[in-house]
Swiss-Prot record:
Its EC number is 7.1.1.2. SUPFAM superfamilies: Thioredoxin-like. One of its GO terms (cellular component) is respiratory chain complex I. [2Fe-2S] cluster binds at residues 135, 140, 176, 180. NCBIfam families: nuoE_fam (TIGR01958), PRK07539.1-5 (NF005725). Residues 1-40 form a transit peptide. It catalyses: a ubiquinone + NADH + 5 H(+)(in) = a ubiquinol + NAD(+) + 4 H(+)(out). This is NADH dehydrogenase [ubiquinone] flavoprotein 2, mitochondrial. Keywords: 2Fe-2S, Electron transport, Iron, Iron-sulfur, Membrane, Metal-binding, Mitochondrion, Mitochondrion inner membrane, NAD, Oxidoreductase, Respiratory chain, Transit peptide, Translocase, Transport, Ubiquinone. The gene is ndufv2. Belongs to the complex I 24 kDa subunit family. Core subunit of the mitochondrial membrane respiratory chain NADH dehydrogenase (Complex I) that is believed to belong to the minimal assembly required for catalysis. Complex I functions in the transfer of electrons from NADH to the respiratory chain. The immediate electron acceptor for the enzyme is believed to be ubiquinone. Residues 211-247 are annotated as: Disordered.
Length: 247
């Protein structure tokens, strides 16, 4: 066992010294926040007595969501209602919030707990005001996501999975966010920031910290997912109609 571990360590050290390999590429993925706690832990702000109810504004949204499904299939609204509760609750979903959603959907609370703990988009512990999710899947890794993670940790003064003392930022690693062609990238709350460098990452974090507007999308000159040389094909206006008239 020891000899096998020693061989593996020697192999990774050799890779680390050659060809710019980073031994972090061979480590296990960071646990997602939904898996960070496999069971509920009572805290002062998250227990069976912590109050939660939808605001009047969100109750209207609840009815609109439920109206999309037949009455006998109210449980189909579980995920959008959990999302609505999470947004109202500052980016995380409490035990009582899950109970409330389960009651509205007419399902057992355990079903809501299972869904919230399965999908990584639901946070069952508190997060900061800005949820920084850096993609570290293969395309982003090959394009330098390791350096982006290192920059975030250094500039924010926290490790992956931690929140800054001022509660401004929470930093996590995530799996593919679907913007591989614009790697490396990260998602902060609902916005994608792509084609990142260490310099542009620091600039973005500073802008957000100071409540200044940011450039969403590619942080370079290119538009959307076009190549680095710009648009080279399909230069003529598209032949219509391209979609239904009522959209």
């Amino acid at each position: 066992m020891f000899r096998s571990l020693l061989k593996r360590t020697t192999f990774l050290n050799q890779l680390n010294k050659s060809n710019g390999f980073n031994r972090n590429y061979f480590k296990q993925s960071t646990l997602t926040r939904s898996d960070a706690l496999s069971r509920h832990v009572e805290t002062e702000d998250n227990n069976e007595h912590t109050p939660f109810d939808f605001t009047q504004e969100n109750l209207v949204k609840v009815e609109k969501i439920l109206a999309k499904y037949p009455k006998q299939y109210r449980q189909s609204a579980l995920i959008p209602l959990l999302d609505l509760a999470q947004r109202q609750n500052g980016g995380w979903i409490s035990l009582r919030a899950m109970d409330k959603v389960a009651h509205i959907c007419g399902i057992a609370p355990m079903t809501a707990y299972e869904v919230a703990s399965f999908y990584t988009m639901f946070n069952r512990t508190k997060i900061g005001e800005n949820f920084v999710q850096v993609c570290t899947t293969t395309p982003c890794m090959l394009r330098g996501s390791g350096e982006i993670i290192k920059t975030c940790k250094s500039h924010l003064g926290i490790q992956v999975g931690e929140t800054t003392p001022d509660n401004k930022f929470t930093l996590v690693e995530v799996e593919c966010l679907g913007a591989c062609v614009n790697a490396p990238m990260m998602c902060i709350n609902d916005d994608f920031y792509e084609d990142l460098t260490s310099a542009s990452t620091i600039n973005l974090l500073d802008q957000i910290k100071n409540n200044k507007p940011t450039k969403i999308g590619p942080q370079t000159h290119r538009k959307a997912a076009e190549g680095p040389q710009g648009k080279t094909t399909l230069l003529e206006p598209p032949v219509g109609p391209t979609c239904r008239d009522d959209l």
